[in-house]
Amino acid sequence: MSTTASTSSNNLTFTSIVKSFFESYSKTPQKLKIIDLFLIYTFITGVIVFTYCCLVGTYPFNSFLAAFISTVGCFVLTVCLRIQINPINNFGKTISIERAFTDYLLCNLILHLVVFNFLG
């Protein structure tokens, strides 16, 4: 009987954690929520590319690597943008949103030039 009580206690703890997460996430600015949606999209694209590689094969291996590097690189750069824009993550350095977004665009341009060059 004690395992049932501890299991229900764990469920209450899990539900309280999930509820707390959604309550705190509802206070997140709209800009960060849009970035989060793009991160989810990029992650799903990377999973699709990797699944395609596993199921179908990697005949044009450079194309697979270019697509996968593009999704991973774009994901990492977007996470960096989210960290820079988030007002909670102010570590004493004040970077304007415009500067962070410009850095993001330039890094994405360099990333995709490298990916395009890698296609051959």
Curated annotation (Swiss-Prot):
One of its GO terms (cellular component) is oligosaccharyltransferase complex. Residues 1-36, 82-99 are cytoplasmic. Disulfide bonds: none annotated. Keywords: Endoplasmic reticulum, Membrane, Transmembrane, Transmembrane helix. The keyword Disulfide bond does not apply. GO terms for biological process: protein N-linked glycosylation. It is found in: Endoplasmic reticulum membrane. The chain crosses the membrane at residues 37-57, 61-81, 100-120. The keyword Endoplasmic reticulum applies. Residues 58-60 are lumenal. It is a multi-pass membrane protein. Pathway: Protein modification; protein glycosylation. It comes from the Eukaryota. PANTHER family: DOLICHYL-DIPHOSPHOOLIGOSACCHARIDE--PROTEIN GLYCOSYLTRANSFERASE SUBUNIT DAD1. Component of the oligosaccharyltransferase (OST) complex. Belongs to the DAD/OST2 family. Subunit of the oligosaccharyl transferase (OST) complex that catalyzes the initial transfer of a defined glycan (Glc(3)Man(9)GlcNAc(2) in eukaryotes) from the lipid carrier dolichol-pyrophosphate to an asparagine residue within an Asn-X-Ser/Thr consensus motif in nascent polypeptide chains, the first step in protein N-glycosylation. N-glycosylation occurs cotranslationally and the complex associates with the Sec61 complex at the channel-forming translocon complex that mediates protein translocation across the endoplasmic reticulum (ER). All subunits are required for a maximal enzyme activity. This is Dolichyl-diphosphooligosaccharide--protein glycosyltransferase subunit 2. It comes from Dictyostelium discoideum (Social amoeba). The gene is ost2.
